[in-house]
Amino acid sequence: MKKSIIALAALFAAAGAQANTISYNFSNPVSTTEITQTGTLGLFDSTLGTLTGASLELQGAARFAFTGTNSAAQAQTANITSSTDLFWSSSIAALSAIVSGTDVFLSLSSGPQSYASGETKSFGPSNKNASVVDDLASILASMEAAGGGNFTLTCNSLSGLAVQGGGGNIDTTQDTAAGCGARIVYTYDEQKVPEPASLALLGLALAGAGVYRRRKA
């Protein structure tokens, strides 16, 4: 009888705790590089329950367009790659230490192309998207506050153009734009008050145990 009551009480306790998620996100428009963009995300409100996990997705978007012109007197073969690297920081020091080691890289390559003397080839515009997810389990204490709140993420871009082949005779132009966004997801256990009917059932079980003990005595 005692074991049954303990099991019943444990069942009610388990039913009271429920796993939940809450998320925040932002997205900035694509702008001509180089960019510095900032967005705001929410802290976890610790009054909602116990924070058990958090993950941050860093998102990048870019638009690439470029040309290559063969300035040599003879035909040339070359591969042109346009790229943008997005680097991150945060208003929360512990988070900044994590995201500063994460970059979102985007690129577009022409692939090997043959250029006749004086020929110009154009590539793009082409849109690219990429993202990286960081696990924030090691800094959960920094990601919550009673009543919630906000923090910021900032991204900066470094863009460039690389030419492989062509003997140094491929002249280029580029038009690059980029934008960044982010999404944070919190996982938490919400402690709910048992329903009155459940409390009554537990009370009856405990009362029954008392009667059982008295009869046994």
Model-identified regions with their sequence ranges:
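N-terminal segment immediately downstream of the Sec signal-peptide cleavage site
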Residues: 20-74, 176-180, 186-192
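N-terminal signal peptide c-region/cleavage motif recognized by signal peptidases
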Residues: 14-16
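Low-complexity, serine/threonine/proline-enriched polar segments
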Residues: 86-123
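Sec-dependent signal peptide recognition
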Residues: 2-8, 198-201
